[in-house]
């Protein structure tokens, strides 16, 4: 799709496990308060592309995104992807008393400032796997770090590293 897209009702997609790729070029996906979801066993990668400029390259609109990334194929494990060549119009804010982002998989927003306010959970039909790559993040209200042990089953192979014994977290 080229340009801004505004939803006028709830949308449910059914795809193969290898998933579908929804590309929005030089525009935003305005959920307009509605829900974009996939059925169980379906996979979706939402990709924002185009040229930097006066465009918003992100989901907006206060609705709900409820989908899992594909579990196989080229976009395996990738749920939301912003083209890394985009450097403007990439910031994202999601808020709500219930999760507005119910996403399973990798959310890749390499140049985004992300603000989340009570807005994230796993997909209704997905595994426990939510991984974000972003420039910086602000979490308002209650924030929680969830165990990501479901990432391999969700099609996302996480990198591993060995930690020497005696390591600790410091403030």
Q: PLM features: what roles do these ranges have?
A:
Residues 1-147:
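Long, polar low-complexity repeats
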Residues 147-171:
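Protruding loop/beta-arch "assembly-hinge" segments enriched in small, turn-prone residues
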């Amino acid at each position: 799709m080229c340009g801004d897209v505004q939803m006028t009702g709830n949308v449910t997609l059914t795809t193969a496990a290898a998933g579908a790729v929804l590309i929005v070029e030089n525009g935003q996906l305005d959920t307009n308060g509605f829900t974009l979801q996939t059925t169980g066993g379906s996979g979706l990668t939402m990709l924002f592309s185009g040229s930097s400029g006066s465009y918003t390259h992100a989901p907006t609109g206060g609705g709900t995104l409820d989908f899992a990334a594909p579990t196989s194929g080229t976009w395996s494990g990738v749920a939301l992807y912003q083209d890394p060549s985009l450097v403007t119009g990439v910031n994202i804010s999601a808020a709500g008393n219930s999760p507005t982002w119910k996403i399973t998989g990798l959310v890749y927003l390499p140049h985004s400032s992300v603000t989340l306010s009570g807005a994230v959970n796993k997909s209704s039909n997905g595994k426990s796997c939510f991984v974000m790559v972003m420039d910086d993040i602000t979490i308002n209200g209650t924030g929680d770090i969830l165990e990501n042990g479901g990432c391999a089953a969700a099609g996302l192979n996480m990198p591993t590293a060995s930690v020497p014994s005696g390591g600790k977290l410091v403030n």
